[in-house]
Amino acid sequence: AMFDPQMLLELVDSGMYLTQCYGMTETCGDGLVNYAQAEPHIRALGRPDGHCEYKLDETGEICIRGGCVMLGYYKDPEATAEIIDAEGWLHTGDLAREDEDGYYYMVGRKKNLIILGSGENVSPEELEQKLSACLAVQECVVKEMGKKIGALVCCSEDRQPEVRAFITELNRTLPLYKRITAVEFSADPLPRNTMGKLLRR
């Protein structure tokens, strides 16, 4: 999960020096490193550390190849083939974009993508981050609701109009296909799995 950029900036302002790292068990922890202490790069995953090769494939998925990448899952060639392609690239499942300075920025998880009937792909995490900027939103999940982009929002009943107004303003900044056109509210915390991650069902 990504850190809140505002929190990172506050830590820097308090005198801390931050180093952010992106990686996974299957790459021995190797990945991207971010030494940035200010905007805009403090919100990035980082840049390649030089130990392996990195690229974004045609879908924007982060791929890693080199000595840091595992040979495969123990006695599970099928699972290995699902994550490592014939050219040796490990597909992380994370979607990102790369800026002109070589920094990678998280967009979302490939498995969470909402694929619309029109062919466009929508990252729910991107919209959740934007929606979370509304102070009335305690937590939220963006998902497909009856062929619409919808949001399930946890907030107090008296602040629901504030959230609706925020979504209206947010939608004006988004392409038509990304706009949130359905919203449901919950006064209770949203359901999570045993790992503490919000459920998208």
Where are these regions (language model features)?
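AMP-binding/adenylate-forming catalytic core of the ANL superfamily
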Residues: G66, L71-G72, L95-K178
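Glycine-/small-residue-rich active-site loops that bind phosphorylated ligands and cofactors
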Residues: F3, D158-R159, P191
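Flexible lysine-rich "adenylation lid" loop at the C-terminal edge of ANL adenylation domains
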Residues: S186-R201
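Conserved AMP-binding/adenylate-forming
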Residues: A1-Y104, K110-L113, L127-E128, Q138, ...
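Hydrophobic/anchoring residues in structured secondary elements
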Residues: V142, A182-F185
